[in-house]
Amino acid sequence: QSAQFRELEYALGIKDRIELDWFSGIEGERLTQRHASATLWDAFVGVMHRQGAPVPAHVLNRDVRETVIENAELQAVIIDRYSDEGFAGLCETLTDLDEGLQEWRYRHVMMVRRTIGTKMGTGGSDGAAYLATTLFRPAFPDLWAIRTAF
């Protein structure tokens, strides 16, 4: 996996620490900084809070170095606000982004399988086998979890 793709994942909220060891030099420094920074999801949650939504304190104060995980309390807040057209549109845009990332991953896995088969990947991973484990790892799990509420 490229450093640029890792930066994108870190910016969205998918933060696997083990991958920091795969990069050195300027790439490693940039990734370490991005890993320690707030995410797009954190910004989204912060906007909700500033607009008066009762976002749980532990969600607002989460360790930004950790991957965003599902939170039932936050899901209830999101569902409650979904009747607001602008808010719902923003949620749908984030879901579109997340879906696009997952679709890109699938296409990437298939390209890798076609190109190198089961050989080791260029980033030091197990190649296509590793990539396949990332296919259904959403950046915004709460936006997927609430789908059953509609």
Give residue ranges: language-model regions.
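C-terminal accessory extensions/subdomains outside the catalytic/core fold
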Residues: 2-150
